[in-house]
């Protein structure tokens, strides 16, 4: 059984029951309807029930989509009188004392309005809000929504509410709290703008630093490629038609062999020279140190690898030079494209080839 109030709220009768729609919003404010039992205690012309509410709105060509009850009791009328008319009903209990200190009431009201506007596709369906008299608590919460969610100033919100309702907010503490809420929002927005400027500055510095690092990497890679080109030119001799280091070679002129090849060939000739005492007489031991003899043997083995090429096994010197030339051309093409990941892969390939050669 629904509990009912036995006393008409104080000063309830002196306020007009329904105000006008707040401009640029869907809010309409009214005082709380009362049940038929309470209506018998006042004059007929002062009565205001849920039936009177819907009748007055219908005469204006208006209709409700949501009713938000801000009173701290449910004894004035039965909410089924609202939901029975296919109108959504929401309750946000707001006490008469200490109300402006209750941030949870503000957040609950904001959430109820936001949820309804997000789901409702009918822009003409009004949002009815009432407390006991439809003045103080209604005025504070509606103005807070206009300030916090719609970006209105406190003066704009208060003026719009008071003109639509026909009455001023009576409690000065509520008005001061609205001005303070608007000031806090402005200060917060200034701090947010300064934080945004700081983020933009850091982003710009980060982008500038990245460009500097990329430029340094390109210079370093160009230097490495230049050194590799110089080394390849010194090793390959005149077989390069277009040297990476810019040295032009005339293919018509005979070019001398590399100095290392000349030394190895002379040592190989000395090793194969017949001995004066006879073919079977072993050569006289060299007067060099054991380290020099070991180096001589290694050079001899290298000359054998360069001068003797068995069919189907290994590569000739000219084949190696051609392969080396192709690799250098590939390196230059990669550098011209300027793609960092390809350049990095070339660097790793060169490092691995040098490491394997040493091993």
UniProtKB/Swiss-Prot annotation:
According to its UniProt record, which residues of this chain constitute the active site? 131
Ranges of biased composition (kind: Basic and acidic residues): 184-199
Under the heading SUPFAM superfamilies, the entry gives: (Phosphotyrosine protein) phosphatases II (SSF52799)
Q: Which InterPro entries match?
A: Dual-sp_phosphatase_cat-dom, mRNA_Capping_Enz/RNA_Phosphat, Prot-tyrosine_phosphatase-like, Tyr_Pase_AS, Tyr_Pase_dom, TYR_PHOSPHATASE_DUAL_dom
Q: Which UniProt keywords apply?
A: Hydrolase, Protein phosphatase
List the source organism: Caenorhabditis elegans
Top-level lineage group: Eukaryota
Residues covered by region (Disordered): 184-211, 234-259, 274-328
Signal sequence range: none
Q: Where is the composition biased (Basic residues)?
A: 200-210, 319-328
| Bias (Polar residues) | 234-246
Which named protein is this?
A: Probable tyrosine-protein phosphatase pir-2
């Amino acid at each position: 059984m629904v509990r009912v109030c036995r006393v008409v709220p104080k000063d309830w009768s002196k306020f007009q029951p329904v105000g006008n729609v707040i401009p640029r919003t869907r809010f309409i404010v009214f005082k709380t309807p009362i049940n038929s039992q309470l209506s018998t205690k006042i004059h007929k012309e002062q009565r205001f029930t849920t039936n009177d509410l819907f009748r007055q709105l219908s005469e204006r060509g208006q209709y409700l989509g949501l009713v938000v009850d801000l009173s701290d009791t449910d004894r004035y009328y039965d909410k089924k009188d609202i939901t029975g008319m296919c109108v959504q009903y929401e309750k946000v209990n707001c006490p008469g004392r200490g109300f402006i200190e209750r941030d949870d009431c503000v957040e609950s009201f904001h959430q109820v309005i936001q949820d309804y506007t997000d789901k409702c596709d009918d822009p003409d369906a009004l949002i009815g809000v009432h407390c006991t008299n439809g003045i103080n608590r209604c005025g504070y919460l509606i103005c807070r929504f206009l300030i916090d969610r719609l970006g209105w100033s406190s003066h704009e919100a208060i003026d719009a509410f008071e003109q639509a309702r026909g009455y001023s907010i009576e409690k000065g503490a509520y008005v001061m709290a609205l001005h303070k809420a608007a000031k806090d929002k402005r200060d917060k927005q200034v701090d947010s703008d300064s934080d945004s400027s700081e983020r933009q500055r850091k982003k710009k510095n980060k982008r500038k630093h990245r460009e500097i690092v990329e430029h340094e990497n390109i210079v370093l890679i160009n230097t490495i490629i230049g050194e590799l080109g110089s080394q390849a030119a010194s090793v390959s001799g005149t077989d390069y038609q277009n040297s990476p280091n810019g040295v032009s070679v005339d293919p018509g002129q005979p070019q001398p062999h590399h100095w290392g090849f000349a030394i190895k060939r002379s040592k190989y000739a000395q090793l194969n020279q017949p001995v004066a005492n006879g073919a079977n007489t072993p050569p006289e031991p060299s007067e060099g140190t054991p380290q020099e003899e070991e180096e001589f043997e290694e050079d001899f083995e290298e000359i054998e690898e360069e001068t003797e090429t068995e069919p189907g096994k290994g590569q000739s010197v000219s084949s190696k030079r051609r392969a080396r030339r192709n690799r250098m051309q590939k390196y230059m093409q990669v550098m011209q494209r300027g793609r960092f990941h390809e350049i990095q892969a070339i660097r790793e390939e060169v490092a691995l080839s040098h490491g394997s050669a040493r091993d």
